[in-house]
Design a protein with these regions (language model features):
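Glycine-biased, low-complexity coil/linker segments
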Residues: 1-2
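Nucleotide 5′-phosphate-binding alpha/beta core
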Residues: 5-84, 90-126, 130-132, 136, ...
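Extended acidic/charged loop-beta regions that coordinate divalent cations
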Residues: 138-142
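A short, well-structured juxtamembrane/interface segment
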Residues: 160-168
């Protein structure tokens, strides 16, 4: 299998348009197949190799169960953080291994701004009860990053402060 190319990943996740989405998705599929051992093996087992996948609708999704049992990553690295799912009692959470938080933030901010415009033009109000009460939530990390980037004094978490939320 191939070598991790961060530049490839960055180009394909920050420069995607409606016009090139399918081509970029197919290119990313081929890249993940070649460089992500868990995903590549899964695709082999279900006979969905790059030779067989020629359209977006045929790209296989990795079952969430594999994120619970395997380290699903592309390339070898020490993660800056590991986000975990909110598993119900007794369940094993799934893991999302993040190499660089700055890169992770760049991707979700660009995605937001592509759809809604400059984040600095928005006030971000976060009311995330079950997420704030546990550690490892990617949603909390995204909300926190967006709150900081918005720069608005009203932006923030309003978990138990409904009175202040009503005033915003």
């Amino acid at each position: 299998r191939g070598h991790w190319d961060r530049g490839f990943f960055m180009r394909n996740f920050t420069d995607i348009t409606d016009q090139n989405f399918e081509a970029a998705a197919l290119e990313m599929f081929r890249y993940q197949y070649a460089n992500n051992q868990v995903y590549g093996k899964f695709c082999d087992l279900i006979n969905r190799t790059p030779k067989a996948v020629k359209a977006l609708k045929n790209i296989p999704f990795l079952p969430v169960e594999l994120y619970k049992k395997h380290r699903v990553v592309t390339g070898a690295f020490t993660p800056e953080t590991v986000f975990t799912s909110s598993a119900t009692t007794g369940e094993t959470p799934s893991n999302h291994w993040v190499k660089e938080l700055a890169h992770y933030e760049q991707v979700y901010v660009k995605g937001f701004e592509r759809e809604f415009g400059d984040l600095e033009d928005w006030t971000v109000l976060a009311l995330l009860p079950s997420y704030l009460e546990r550690s490892g939530s990617s949603l909390v990390a995204m909300a926190e990053g967006m709150i900081k980037r918005s720069g608005k004094k009203e932006s923030g978490f309003y978990l138990y402060n409904h009175g202040a939320l009503e005033k915003v």
